[in-house]
C-alpha cells in the first residue's frame, strides 16, 4: 500500500489549477501578485494601481484603506494609521520610546500590548494589518474571479516570533489561509535567481519603508540556501523622511512642539522632497512661514549615517557566511527606498558591481511570494525548487550554573528539529524548569530569555539517572516549539514561544557584536561555572555517602581525610580560579576512591546475599 505525501495545502488533483497569491505586506506599501499563464504578475486595483499604501483610516461609519486613507492623513492624523508594521509585536513602552513623534493616542491593553484610540474605538496593530490584507484579498478575488485557496505572506528576515505570529493572526482575522510566511529577501531571490537559472552567491539588499534586511544566498543545482542574514527591524526609508523632516524643522527655526496635523504635513513634505531629489539636483521647500532649498548633496550627507549602518550589517552578514564581497556574483536591490540614487551607488561601491534592478524593486518581493504560493498550493507538482531559510540567533537552554547549552545554532536552515538529553542534578528530583534562551553568549544572564516552563512527574531517582529529552522545533514560518519528555514514563510538557514584544533596535546586531567582543571572557566564565557545578555535584555526593555509609565502612581517620578534602573544595568553589577548583575536585576524588570501592563491594554483597551460585 502506497501513501501519497504532499506539502500541506498542495492539490491532490494533479491538473486542477488553484487560485493562490503572494502578498508583500510592507511598511509603506503593500502588493498582491499571482501566477497567471505561467508568469507571476502584480494585480492592479480598479484604477490600474498595483501599489496599495499601507494606510488605514478609521471613520465613524467606515474604514478606508490605501490611497484614500493616505490622502486623509494630514487632515485626520489620529485616526489614520501609517506604517503599522513598525508597531507589530512591540510593547507600548518600546513604541513610545522609539517613535515619540507618532500622532496616535495610545493606551495599553490588559496583556501589555498597544492599542490605538480611533473614531471606531480601540484597535491594535494586528487588526489594522488585517484591514490591509482584506483589501488585497478582495482585489485578488475580483481580478482572478474566484476564492483564494491560500496565500504566502512575506515578512522581514529579522521579524521575531511575536511579529511573525502577529502577522499570521492578522491574516486569520482577514479570512486568509496562510500557506507560509516567507522572508522578504528570500522571496526576491526566488523572483530573480530561479527564473534566470543562475548559480552562485547572491546578496539581497532589501531597504523598505521601515525595515532593512541583508541576506547572503547560494543557488546551486536547484537548491536555494540562505547562508546568512542580517539587518535592522527598525531602519528604512521612513527614517530618511524623519531625518529630512528634522532638518526642515531646524531650518524653519521651529522649537515648539507641532500639532498632530502639522507633524503629518511635515512628514508628507519630507517624503515628497525625497522622491523629487531622485530626479533633481535641487528642490525648493516651503513649510509654514519658511521657504528654502535643499541640494541632493546635502540630502545625501543627511542620510549617509543611515546607509552606513546598512553597509555595516552587510559586512557582518558576509563574515557570518564566510564569504568575501568579491565572491558575490550579483547584488539584488529590493524595496522602494533603493530607488534613492545614493543608496544604489553606495551599495554598488561596497560590493564593487552594479546592483540588479531589472525587476521593479517595489514588486519583486510580491512576485517571488506568488511563485512560492503557486508551488505550495499544488499548481507546480514537478517543481524542484528547495527553499531553505535560516534562524538569525542561536536557540538554547539554561543548564546548571547559569550556562547556555545551544541546541540550534544561528544560521541553521529551517524548518528544523533538534533534540538533546539532559538529566537531574539532585537525588529524588521530580521536576525540572526548562528555560529557553536566545543569543550567542555563554551565560544565561547575557542572553535573551524567550520562555520558561516546567516538566513535572519525573519519577524519583538518583541524581543523573533520569533521562529528559528536550526537542526544539522551528517551523517554516520561524515559530519555535519546545517539548520536554521524561523517557521512562513518557510524561511531557510543551510550549510555543511567543515573546510579548519584538527585539529592540539593533539588538540582534549588538548581540552578535557582544559575542565576539566578550568571547574570551565568556569562555573563562563558562569554564569557571562548569567547574563550580561539578564541585557542587562532588561535594553533595560525598556528603550523602558519608552520612549513609561513613561510620560503617571508614575509620575516624579515613573520614577525617575525606572531610578535609571536601572542606578544601568548598573553599576553592567559592573562588574564581577554575583550574584550582578542578585540582580540588581531583584531590577529593583521590581521597574518596577507597571509600567508593568499599561502597561498591558492599552493594554487590547486599545484592547477592541469600542467592546460590546457580542463581547468580
From Swiss-Prot:
Name the UniProt key words of this record, in alphabetical order. Answer: ATP-binding, Chaperone, Nucleotide-binding
Q: For this chain's UniProt record, which GO biological process terms are given? A: iron-sulfur cluster assembly
UniProt KW Nucleus keyword: no
Q: Which InterPro entries match?
A: ATPase_NBD, Heat_shock_70_CS, HscA_NBD, HSP70_C_sf, HSP70_peptide-bd_sf, Hsp_70_fam, ISC_FeS_clus_asmbl_HscA
* Listed GO MF terms: ATP binding; ATP hydrolysis activity; ATP-dependent protein folding chaperone; unfolded protein binding
The free-text function statement in the UniProt record for this protein reads:
Chaperone involved in the maturation of iron-sulfur cluster-containing proteins. Has a low intrinsic ATPase activity which is markedly stimulated by HscB.
> Which family, according to UniProt?
Belongs to the heat shock protein 70 family.
- In its UniProt entry, what is this protein called? Chaperone protein HscA homolog
Organism whose genome encodes this protein: Aliivibrio fischeri (strain MJ11) (Vibrio fischeri)
Amino acid at each position: 500500500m502506497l501513501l501519497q505525501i504532499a506539502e500541506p495545502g498542495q492539490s491532490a488533483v494533479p491538473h486542477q489549477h488553484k487560485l493562490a497569491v503572494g502578498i508583500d505586506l510592507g511598511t509603506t506599501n503593500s502588493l498582491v501578485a499571482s501566477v497567471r499563464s505561467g508568469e507571476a504578475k502584480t494585480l492592479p486595483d480598479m484604477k490600474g494601481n498595483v501599489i496599495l499604501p499601507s494606510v488605514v483610516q478609521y471613520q465613524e461609519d467606515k474604514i478606508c484603506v490605501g490611497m484614500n486613507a493616505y490622502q486623509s492623513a494630514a487632515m485626520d492624523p489620529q485616526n489614520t494609521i501609517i506604517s503599522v508594521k513598525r508597531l507589530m509585536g512591540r510593547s507600548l513602552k518600546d513604541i513610545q520610546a522609539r517613535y515619540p513623534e507618532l500622532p496616535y493616542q495610545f493606551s495599553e491593553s490588559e496583556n501589555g500590548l498597544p492599542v490605538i484610540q480611533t473614531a471606531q474605538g480601540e484597535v491594535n496593530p494586528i487588526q489594522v494589518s488585517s484591514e490591509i490584507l482584506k483589501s488585497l484579498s478582495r482585489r485578488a478575488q475580483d481580478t482572478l474571479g474566484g476564492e483564494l485557496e491560500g496565500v504566502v505572506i512575506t515578512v522581514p528576515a529579522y521579524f521575531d516570533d511575536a511579529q511573525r505570529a502577529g502577522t499570521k493572526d492578522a491574516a486569520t482575522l482577514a479570512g486568509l489561509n496562510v500557506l507560509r510566511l516567507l522572508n522578504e529577501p528570500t522571496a526576491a531571490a526566488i523572483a530573480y535567481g530561479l527564473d534566470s537559472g543562475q548559480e552562485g552567491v547572491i546578496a539581497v539588499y532589501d531597504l523598505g519603508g521601515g525595515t532593512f534586511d541583508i541576506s547572503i544566498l547560494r543557488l546551486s543545482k536547484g537548491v536555494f540556501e540562505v547562508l546568512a542574514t542580517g539587518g535592522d527591524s527598525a531602519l528604512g526609508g521612513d527614517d530618511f523622511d524623519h531625518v529630512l523632516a528634522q532638518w526642515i524643522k531646524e531650518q524653519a527655526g521651529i522649537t515648539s512642539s507641532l500639532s498632530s496635523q502639522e507633524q503629518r504635513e511635515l512628514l508628507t513634505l519630507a517624503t515628497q522632497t525625497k522622491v523629487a531629489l531622485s530626479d533633481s539636483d535641487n528642490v525648493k521647500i516651503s513649510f509654514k512661514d519658511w521657504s528654502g532649498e535643499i541640494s541632493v548633496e546635502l540630502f545625501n550627507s543627511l542620510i549617509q549615517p543611515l546607509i552606513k549602518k546598512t553597509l555595516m550589517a552587510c559586512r557582518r552578514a558576509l563574515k557570518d557566511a564566510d564569504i568575501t564581497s568579491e565572491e558575490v556574483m550579483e547584488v539584488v536591490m529590493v524595496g522602494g527606498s533603493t530607488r534613492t540614487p545614493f543608496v544604489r551607488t553606495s551599495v554598488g561601491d561596497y560590493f564593487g558591481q552594479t546592483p540588479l534592478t531589472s525587476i521593479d524593486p517595489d514588486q519583486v518581493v510580491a512576485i517571488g511570494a506568488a511563485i512560492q504560493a503557486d508551488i505550495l498550493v499544488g499548481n507546480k507538482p514537478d517543481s524542484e525548487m528547495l527553499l531553505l531559510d535560516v534562524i538569525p540567533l542561536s536557540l538554547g537552554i539554561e543548564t546548571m550554573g547559569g550556562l547556555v547549552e545551544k541546541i540550534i545554532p544561528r544560521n541553521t536552515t529551517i524548518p528544523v528539529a533538534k533534540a538533546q538529553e539532559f538529566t537531574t542534578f539532585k537525588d529524588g528530583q521530580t521536576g525540572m524548569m526548562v528555560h529557553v534562551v536566545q543569543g550567542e553568549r555563554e551565560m544565561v544572564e547575557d542572553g535573551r530569555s524567550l520562555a520558561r516552563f516546567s516538566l513535572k512527574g519525573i519519577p524519583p531517582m538518583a541524581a543523573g539517572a533520569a533521562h529528559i529529552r528536550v526537542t526544539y522545533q522551528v517551523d517554516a514560518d520561524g515559530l519555535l516549539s519546545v517539548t520536554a519528555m521524561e523517557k521512562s514514563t513518557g510524561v511531557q510538557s510543551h510550549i510555543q514561544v511567543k515573546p510579548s514584544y519584538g527585539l529592540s533596535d539593533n539588538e540582534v546586531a549588538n548581540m552578535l557584536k557582544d559575542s565576539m567582543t566578550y568571547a574570551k571572557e565568556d569562555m573563562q566564565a563558562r569554564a569557571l561555572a562548569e567547574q563550580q557545578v561539578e564541585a557542587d555535584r562532588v561535594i553533595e555526593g560525598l556528603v550523602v555517602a558519608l552520612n549513609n555509609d561513613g561510620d560503617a565502612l571508614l575509620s575516624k581517620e579515613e573520614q577525617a581525610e575525606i572531610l578535609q578534602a571536601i572542606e578544601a573544595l568548598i573553599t576553592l568553589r567559592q573562588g574564581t580560579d577554575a583550574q584550582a577548583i578542578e585540582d580540588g575536585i581531583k584531590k577529593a576524588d583521590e581521597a574518596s576512591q577507597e571509600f567508593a570501592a568499599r561502597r561498591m563491594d558492599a552493594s554487590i554483597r547486599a545484592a547477592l546475599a541469600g542467592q546460590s551460585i546457580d542463581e547468580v
